[in-house]
Structures are given as C-alpha cells and as structure tokens.
Design a protein with these regions (language model features):
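N-terminal helical cap/lid subdomain that shapes the substrate entry/recognition surface
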Residues: 2-108, 112, 127-128
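Asp-based, Mg2+/Mn2+-dependent phosphohydrolase catalytic module
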Residues: 1-12, 82, 104, 108, ...
Length: 233
C-alpha cells in the first residue's frame, strides 16, 4: 500500500480523545457540566436528543467550537462557553477500561523506533490515566494542553512538540480524529497526518474531508506497520 506520508519518520504525535480513549469520556463530562449549570438556571437536565443533535452536527462539520454551540443552544448564551469548560474539567477523566487496546499496542510497537509525543487538548489528570493504563513507558514527550499552556489548533503547540522531539515537520506524523484541531493545523506546518475515523470524527466523512489527510484509518491496528516502514531507526 502506498501512503503519501514522510519517507523518513522521526517523530509521531498522537491525540488522546479518539485515538487513545473513547470520546464518550468527554461527552459524559460535558453533559454533567451542562446539567449542573442548567440546574442553577432553574432548568431541567439536557434532553439527550438535543445534545446528540448538536454533538453530531459538530462531528459532521469538523469545524467551529462545540462548547460554544452547546452553550448557545443549551445554556441560552455563548458567553457560558468558558464557564462550561471550567465546570466540565473535574468530570473530564478517562476511567479504567475506556482506552482502545489498539492504541497501547501501537505505542508499544513504535517505542524505540520514533519519538512518541502526546499532543492533546486535555486536563492534567490525563497523564495519570495514561500512566495507569500502561502508556507512560512509551511516551517521550508529554504535550498536555493544561500543563504546557498551548492548545490545538495553535501553531505554537505543534512547534513546541517539534522542538521537544528534536525534529522537523517533514519527518513527523500527527495522529488525530478531528480535521479542525488535528489534520489541518498539522498539515499547515508540513507535518504528515493520519486521521482516525472514530470518536469525534464524522460517521460518514465526505470525499473532500477524506482528501484532507494523508491517510484515513478506521482504527490504529495498521498504523504501526505504516510508520515502521518509514521509521528513521
């Protein structure tokens, strides 16, 4: 199989929600935070149908702020966006058993062949979850937004990760499940991209969306083979 990725790969960046853990963890945290705020407003809990409609619309579009849309439509004003983020933070965890088995296997196989970096918009507690679930021995660089002070899709976050890995865009691949915060900003820097079609990825991506990534995969089972063919080691 011919894949338009870098001929020589020195580093691999990986998102957390979607590639490693189920995005249900984030969705559940958001629901709890929404219900908490709505209770203070004297309103009933969020209707699951309304939540799913907004969430699925964001998945399909692969653009725009999901938190802003939820704040506007379910809390009555987009100004609640920051408050929603603050409220969901303590609930946004990754319980044991929610990691995808193919993710740990990919990290295990790539360890020692490329530099492996977590590059994700996550809370600091994510490091503890990844450590508990066996990823820590294979991670060379911990790019957790709440810790390093950068968030995707900022150019600065990807540049920070490149610097920490001691490599350049043309020898790097980023793995993520969103176009707007993973594929597009990485490609803008010349980083190779692998789009994982689970979690917040659209259930039925369009041909145009699929064409944005160098490689689109349903899961991580084949990714290690693709990268090892091009690994610098």
């Amino acid at each position: 199989m011919t894949v338009p990725l870098p001929d020589r790969i020195e580093a691999v960046f990986c998102d957390v929600g979607g590639p490693i853990y189920s995005d249900d963890n984030f969705a559940n945290a958001v629901r709890r935070a929404l219900d908490e705020i709505r209770a203070e407003q004297g309103r009933p809990p969020v209707d699951p149908v309304d939540f799913d409609r907004i969430y699925d619309r964001g998945r399909a579009a692969q653009s725009g702020s999901l938190r802003r849309a939820l704040a506007t439509e379910l809390l009555g004003d987009e100004s609640y966006r920051d408050e929603l983020h603050r409220r969901l933070a303590p609930y946004w965890t990754h319980p044991e058993g929610t990691a995808y088995p193919d993710a740990l296997e990919m990290f295990r196989r790539l360890h020692g062949h490329v530099r492996l970096a977590i590059v994700a918009n996550q809370e600091a507690a994510t490091v503890d979850a990844l450590t508990r679930d066996g990823f820590a021995p294979y991670v060379d660089v911990w790019g957790i937004s709440a810790v390093v002070g950068h968030e995707k899709p900022s150019r600065e976050f990807f540049e920070w990760a490149l610097h920490e890995c001691g490599t350049t865009p043309e020898h790097t691949v980023h793995i993520g499940n969103r176009l707007d915060t993973d594929v597009r900003p990485a490609r803008a820097l010349g980083i190779g991209t692998i789009w994982v079609l689970r979690g917040e990825a659209p259930p039925d991506p369009t041909p145009e969306q699929l064409a944005e990534a160098d490689l689109a995969v349903p899961d991580l089972t084949t990714v290690a083979d693709v990268i090892l063919e091009r690994a610098a080691s």
